[in-house]
Amino acid sequence: MHFVEAKSLLSRWNGMNLYRGCVHGCVYCDSRSSCYQFTHPFEDVEVKQNAPQLLESAMRARRKACMISTGSMSDPYQPCEVELCLMRRCLEKIERYGFGASVITKSDLVLRDIELFDRINRKSKSVLQMTLTVSDEGLSRILEPNVCTSAERYAVLREFQRRQIPTVVWLTPLLPFLTDTRENVQCLLDWCFDAGVKGIVCFGAGLTLRDGSREYYYRALDRHFPGLSDQYRKTYANAYEVNSPDHAALMRLFHRECEKHGVLHDPEDCFRYIAAMPAQTAQLSLFDA
């Protein structure tokens, strides 16, 4: 990893990335795509060491409290977060200023900060967003080798449910010929319903492949599933959207089950829920901080 002094932190949508790059090693990672123009190796994580100070300045400049969310490009709970505590320090400042917090992660390291999420949620609002991809433990360790499995993330969701902290799941990607089975999707959905998630984000039964991420994904397929990359090339050529042959049936299953259990399943509805601040905490007085 290497350290930088960032010039700014929050996007116009109040999103932030504390780290740039990732060491989780997910074989399908879209953030490896060349369009993102990384100037350093993806695993050489860039650390925005002044992020907590930038966040505090940005919050002090706002007249109203809002939800502060981490981006999906780089998980805020990198292994180095154990020592650096950037995410934790940002959460402490979010709590102090009465803002809301939403974090998207695949790591059970988020449990370290559950007390902070609890306090923020009691004062304003916090939402944990967690990615679930595959119910099979062995396959999960192949596809996402350096982070906890989806089954372990389910346990995290249950713990947040116990604290009555809202959760949203990203059910993506579903990999053609690997995880795009009815059995896998149904198991993941059952976990979501059992954990009381508010919404499930699913853009389709498939994944996206671009220059940079496609080559990395195919090399992983060649290592672990010989011949499968050839099947992808024959089926999809260089397509960006790579949908499962069972896409339509799986999406019908997804929407039907979510409707039955009263769970948000339109991505825009999920995003609106995440971004909405409770009316009683939307107005911020900095003199209370």
Predicted feature residues:
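Auxiliary Fe-S-binding modules of radical SAM enzymes
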Residues: 1-5, 183-289
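Short, electropositive alpha-helical surface patch
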Residues: 84-87, 118-130, 179-196, 221-224
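Short beta-strand segments at enzyme active-site cores
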Residues: 68-69, 104, 167-171, 200-204
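A structural motif
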Residues: 98-99, 165, 197
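Surface-exposed amphipathic alpha-helices with a cationic face
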Residues: 118-121, 157-162, 255, 259
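Conserved strand-turn element in the central/C-terminal portion of the radical SAM core barrel
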Residues: 135-137, 144-146, 159-181, 204-207
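Acidic-and-aromatic substrate-binding clefts and catalytic sites of carbohydrate-active enzymes
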Residues: 47, 109-111, 176-179, 208
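Conserved Radical SAM active-site core
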Residues: 1-129, 133-141, 150-154
